[in-house]
Each structure stands twice: as structure tokens, then as C-alpha cells.
Amino acid sequence: MSDSKALRVATIFSLTLLATTALAQTKPQPYNAAPWENVLYGAAYYNEYMPADLQPGRLDKDIALMKQADISVVRMGESTWSLWEPEDGRFEYAWMDRVVDAMGKAGIKVIMGTPTYSIPTWMYHEHPEVLVDLLTGPKPAYGMRQNMDISNPTFRFYAQRLIRNLVEHYRNNPDVIGWQVDNETGSYNANNPEVFTGFVDHLKQKFGTTDNLNKAWFLNYWGQDVNGWENMPPRQNATSTGYKLEWSRWQQMRVTDYLSWQAAIVREYRRPDQFVTQDFSDAVHRDVNEFEVAKALDIVSVNPYHGTQDHMDGQIQAQAGDYYRSLKHANYLVTETNAQTTYWASSFQYPPYDGQLRLDVYTHLSSGANMVEYWHWHSIHSGQETYWKGVLSHDLEPNRPYAEVSRTAHELQKIGPQLIDLKITNQVAILYSHDSLNAIDFMPFASTGPRWTFGPASADYSSEVNQLHTALYNLNVGTDFVFPEDPDFSRYKVLIVPMLYIADDALLQKISDFVKNGGHVLMTFKSGFANENSAVRWVRAPGPMREAAGFSYQEFSNLEKPLALKDDPFHAGTDENKVSYWAEFLMPEHAKALAYYDHPFFGKWPAITENNYGNGTLTYEGTYLSDTLQKAVVEQVLKEASLTGPDQQLPAPVHVKHGVNRQGKQLHYYLNYSSEAQTFTYPYKEGTDLLTGNAVTSSAKMTLQPWDVAIVEEK
């Protein structure tokens, strides 16, 4: 950016801040809305995406269809900065006002998004420096969304100016109930000069001196000591695991700062009954610390996309719900999910079977969602997401999905007040570590490449977390997620600790204390191996966990091919009695072996151990288990914690979720993820199936049709 442009931006920024101060509330008020009366159900809506000749009259037709279907909420505005501000400093609202007003007259609520994730062409033309410098390559050309440096001061100037104008314009509109800041935000792999300068400032604050940094990162290796902050090398070719880990933390901090910054601006103007949220994409992220971002939000939202047809089993939705509900231990929103087919090409078009859209809605509600919205209302006719279809297809006419959405919405109008604000109390939690996710990615334990080469990882931290959650899900055990930052884990009976590769001594002590005080821990390999700076501990593994684990080890090995466990101790069967990728040579000191490798060399060491420590137990897996073995080990831990019962007797396609509704009554969701009817025995107190109105007695036989659901409210 030229000096004249920089001066112009700085001057405008200062004047804008002065001018907007009078508009902003002197003290932002906390979110304070009356409880919603019903579950919200709707879709993202983009009248502006319609073919130009359809736009004027299409709005009324869409609203008529929405009213006929009992749609109650739409999300709008987050994708079209160029319409809000077609040229620098000229703001247009009429195009959206007509939509918001029409929705309001129809009784449909609006969530408005800040449109900052896709910059307009005029900004790129005037300020190409706002584009991200990729860590992995050159600056990209304009054309893709999410291609800017979110910490760039020029970008931030334009973003804050737009946000202030937008929120001020709609703050008094009673139909706008909330604000979504940005959209599926990430760091975008940014390596701009300002990003690196900020990183060095972060290191100064954290480590104080370069001498402390050198010691923490062991930079005397290969003679890479940093002698003066001005000599800090760039990230691109860094080999230090400490450097790479801290850089990943810095990228997470940038995202937290950016979204907190947007949320703070919105709060200056919004009404106290307008919430602030962010729609996280469905997966957990290497460059986003959702736990920290959630502190800046009133409500957490997530966009979970999932398998359809024969690949819909509810696990993806359940894991997303469990994770995002756990961030604030509160109900959450689903801001996007499958309407019809998904994907950016026509090579992955699998529309849902009859019943799957409806089942998906109740799946989310059973995990604690208070809103379900589709992406999106109507399919678009051109662009990258042409084949990411909405409720209406490209012909914009009512169709099979619309009929199912209508059926579901009509049901929610009747029973939604008994479903909203479901309170879920679980006794099992998975400890999730962003640091371990990234550090294991830097030093993978499983590779598809031949020896001495680096191929794509065939298993990693995420696959282990997913496997463990799937085991719990398939056992019908409600699950929360906890994080290293949580003060303690005492609310749970069982703590699942997947590959806690990065941990300071305090976190490991907290886990040991949990066991000592009567908790049950299932911990998997690589846990306790490295400290908070990704340096391997200089004591025998598993470091501070040694006493609680009851073993130590000095060696480990990759496994070139899967090994069986001797005598199939968990009755997994020949095909599934297998472990892969990695084996730690566990030497029991107090622990007992639960399984040994069936191998002439590896067979001298246990693959799985269990140790009684204090009033609790710690079960440890020194290798990567098959899915069937993992489920069996998890089930054994649950039995020892007295957490099994009738829910584990359900037929495999049926899943059950429990919670207490706003009226203080226990709800039991039964969900059939199969194309066949399923019959089972209802084991709880008598109640009423809210969807049919039928009485349900204890020990009664219940039958669910394919892709069907029952919701029993106890008396």
C-alpha cells in the first residue's frame, strides 16, 4: 500500500471512530433475551442470488411457501459485502430492507450475518495487500472467498466500518434476533508481514528473552539459536517442533482476537435481546480454538454436514453437538446442515432418503440444539456451490424435501415448546487437545509412504478422537468434551484421554488426581510424552503419569502390518482382533496386562494395561486399536464405572439420547438410522410419545419405522 493510501485509510479510520462513538452505546449491555417459546426452524435465504428477472416477485412466493411450511427463521446477509457497500463508503440497505420487512410481516425471524468473509472487488483493486500471503505459497489471486488476512489493519478498517453501519441500521428492528459474526472463520494459513511481526511480539511477551526461547525450543540443535528478536527466522522452513506448535497457537489466537473484536463491535450497537454467535464449520480445526472463541459469544453455532442415504448414522451430528454444546455447557444452534445434496461438484450427489431430513432435525435437538437451519432455502443457479442444493431445487417449486421439511415444521409447532432448552447431563467426557492435534500432525505416527519417506497420514489425532466418540455413540453413552483449560473434571465418572501428546505437568497431575479421587480414565498411546513446548520429557515415559498409569516404557515401534492380540481377549473376532501403526513397549510396575501382542518379538509387552490408583482406575492403550476392539475396551471401562444398562441392549441402528426439558420432565429420544423397522423394549418410566400422542408404559415394546423417531416424555 502506498504512503498516500495508508494515510488516507488511517485518517478515515480515526474520523469514522469519532463519528460512530455517538451512535454506539456507552456501555455494551449483556445479552438478555426472554427465553424462546419454541425451537427455531428455517434456512439461509438469499433473494439476491435469484436470477435477476425473478427477484422482484420471487420474495413473496418464497415467503408464502415458508409460511405454508411453518418456517420460523432465516439467516441472511453474510455473503454479499459488495451489495452492502458497492463502492468505498457508499452503503446500500434497500435491497435487504425489503426482505427483512417482508419476513417480519410474515412472522419469520432474522439472523443477520456480518459479510466480512468475502471481500468486494473494489477493495482488492484498491488494496491488494489485504489478501493473505500463504504459508505454503505465493499470494493468491482474487476470486475465492476467505482469501484475506484477518489481522490486516486496512481490512479491519473497512470491516469495522461496515459492521458498525450494518448493526446500527438494524439494531431497532424487532425481527432481527441475532448477529452472526463472520462465517466459518479460520486463519487461512496467513503468513503476511503483520502476522509474523505479531508472532514475534507474542513470543516476547510469552518467553521474555531469546535465551528463554532457545532453551524452551532446544534451538541449539542444528545451531539455530536466536540471538536477538530481530533475528527470528520466518515460519516457512522451520523444523523446530516448538516453533511449529507455537505458530499454530498464534494462528488460533489471531482467530480468537478477530472474532472477539467483531463481537465487541456488534455489542456496542445491538439491542440486549439480540445474540451474538459464530457459525463454526462442522469439523474441529487446527487453526481455531473454539473453546476460547466461545467466550466472546452469547450462543455457539455449528454447521454440521453429514452422510446421507446408507451413510447416515447420526454420529457426525452427535459429535458436533456434543463438542459445541460443551464449549459453554449450554444449548447451541445449527446454522447450516444438509437440505438436499452437498459438494462443490456433481460427482457427489446423494440426496437423503425419505425420512432422513426429519430424522436429522430430531438428531440435532436430541443433542441440545435450539435451532436447525438448512443451507439453504433455494438452490443457486451459478457459481461454486451450484450443486450444494437447498430445500427447493433449481426449478424453485415445492418438492419431496420441501414436503418433509413442512411435515417436520408442523410437528415442531406443536411439540417444540417441550423440546427447546433440553438440559443434558453426562457422566463421560473426552479430553480434547488442540495442541496434541497439531503436534502429532507435525510428527505423524502413521504414514502411507514407504520407509524413510513421508506419505499422507493414515491415522492421526482426529481419527483417534472420532473412533473413541463413535465407540461411545454406538454404546448409547452420552458424551461431553472437556479441554485442558477446564479447571477440573470432577463432574464426570469417566474421562477419555486420546493421545495427549502435549501437556504440561499441571494437566497431567489434574488427570492423576481425577483417578486418585475415584475417576476412571481411558488413555491412549503417546500421552504424556512431550511437554507444553513439544519437547520430549527427559524422564521415562509416560512422565508424570507414571504412578497413576502403573507402567513405564523406553522404546516404541511402528508396526509394518496389523498385529493380532493374543487369544482375542475382547472377543473381537479374527478380522477385528487387530492393532496397527504403533506399539509402545509397556513395562508394568503396578498395572496388570489386559492384552498382549500375538507376535514372537512384540509379544513380551502388553498392548493394553489397567492400573488401580487411589480410588480409581487408569486403562491405557499402547497401540492403535481396530474399531471393534476400541468399542470393547470402552465398554469394559464403562462397566467398571457402573455406567451400562438398558441403553446398551438396543438394536444397533437405534440410538437413544436423554435430557430434561424446560418443564422439568425427562425426555428420551429414540432414533432409527436404518432402512428397516426396529423393535425394542422401552425401559423407563411411563410417558407419552410426543410425536404420536400415544401412551408408553414401562417395559412396552416400541417399533420404529425406517428412519423414524420417537420422543417419550415421562409423566
Task: Give the predicted meaning of each segment.
Residues P272, Y305-K715:
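Carbohydrate-binding surfaces of carbohydrate-active enzymes
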Residues P51-M66, D282-V293, Y353-V361:
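Short, acidic/polar
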Residues L59-P138, Q262-Y269:
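Aromatic-lined substrate-binding rim segments of carbohydrate-active enzymes
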Residues M1-T11:
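Bacterial N-terminal signal peptides that target proteins for export
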Residues T136-I299, N303-I316:
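Polysaccharide-binding and catalytic clefts of secreted carbohydrate-active enzymes
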Residues Q25-V73, P86, D101, Q418:
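N-terminal carbohydrate-binding accessory modules
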Residues Y41-L54, S79-A94, A141-Y158, T185-N189, ...:
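The substrate-binding groove and active-site-proximal loops of carbohydrate-active enzymes
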